[in-house]
Amino acid sequence: MSSEAEAVSSAIQETVTAAPAAVPATKSMSIIVTKGSLDWAYPPFILATTAAAMGLPVTMFFTFYGLPLLLKKLDLKLTAAGNPAMKMPMMGAHMGLPNILTAVPGVDAACSKMMKNLMNKKGVASIEDLRELAIEADVRMIACQMTMDLFEYDLDDMIEGPELGGAATYIECATQADINLFI
């Protein structure tokens, strides 16, 4: 595990230790992961690893655009188009881009690079590290078989650990879970 992942793991453990009450062992969580952009990749992995650190069994179901988060090689990007809440700290203020500028070629690449640099500077773990933490915490990951077929992904393209399953596999899990999230 990288030092970045170890730092995140320690931070999660500290958060869990400081939690006012322990979560009953009978609680569980499921997350449908539908988005695979840089900014949308973080919430499901942060919630999954935190819940797992708190002792909850967690299942993540990766479908449609969330499925590429299970690829061995990630190339995460974000788009500023239509995201008025995306204001980056620059020159002592939080500045956003007018939507018209987001149509300029190269803006998404620049925004992605700026976000990755900011995350690195602030010590935010990479998705690769969070994914590794999830696997180490025994988070159950299900790759949607229909999406694999639809987008012609091969199991060899994916990291080791996730199982293949479909909607019925997820629904079976979700009907038993106390917390169900759609991200």
Question: Where are these predicted regions, by residue range?
Answer:
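Positively charged, low-complexity intrinsically disordered leader regions
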Residues: 2-21
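A charged, amphipathic interaction segment
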Residues: 108-165, 169
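A glycine-rich helix N-cap at a beta->alpha junction
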Residues: 78-119, 123
